[in-house]
Amino acid sequence: MSEAELLQAVEAHRWLQSLRLRPNLVTSGVVPEARLVAEESALLDPLNLTGAHVLEVGAANGFFSLAARRRGAARVVATDHLAWTLPGADAQSATQWAAHALDLEVETLALDPRGLSADFGSFHVVLATAFFEQLFNPIQALRGLRSVTNRVLVLETLQNELADVRPMMTAQSRIMPFGGADGSWISGWAPNPPLMLQLLRDLGFNRVLYRNHPTLGAARGIYAALLPEAPDGLLAGFEAPWINMTSPPAG
């Protein structure tokens, strides 16, 4: 594909994420490349993905799925629901095209995480970003993620009520940059860390780690939840600023 053909193909899509397809070509996504690169480091640096099976939920244009393949994952499945299914959304086809342009094998599937079950399969790493704020029933979706996780779940989300020690979440509504030409109003939730810890413990994760978002601070949080069968060696990569919310480990 010539540079002119590549540029024409890029301009044919509406991009949610800024993907670097060539040294001098970055898609004009809503989320800037610098933020995505910082998020990739925060989300994936603690993990050795060599040979891993990875599921991404809320993939948008697949930035982190593509990163997982670069980091040696043997299988990567990128999924999204709203950004890939609302009328006029083309984020799934953009993801497929980007994977082709980068010569990276990533499976794509439009999927509502609330419908996930063990029948879908099992993944060493399940990654979910912008999670709670895009789902009317995020707890049901969290159960779905648990059903397909066999080692670690990494989850990034909007947060609120950070000063309250009680587990809680607050309702959120905002325009998201997909669907119609002017975007779509999406209603969801913003949990606080005590709620996230309680939910993840209730679902059987016995080690829960936390860090603030690398560029947005405590307004967004990143959680890594490990199952009892996950080897203790997985904890070695979670150095500061990660903190262990379940130290000493539960159960």
Where are these regions (language model features)?
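Conserved N-terminal segment of class I S-adenosyl-L-methionine
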Residues: 1-122, 170-172, 193, 218-251
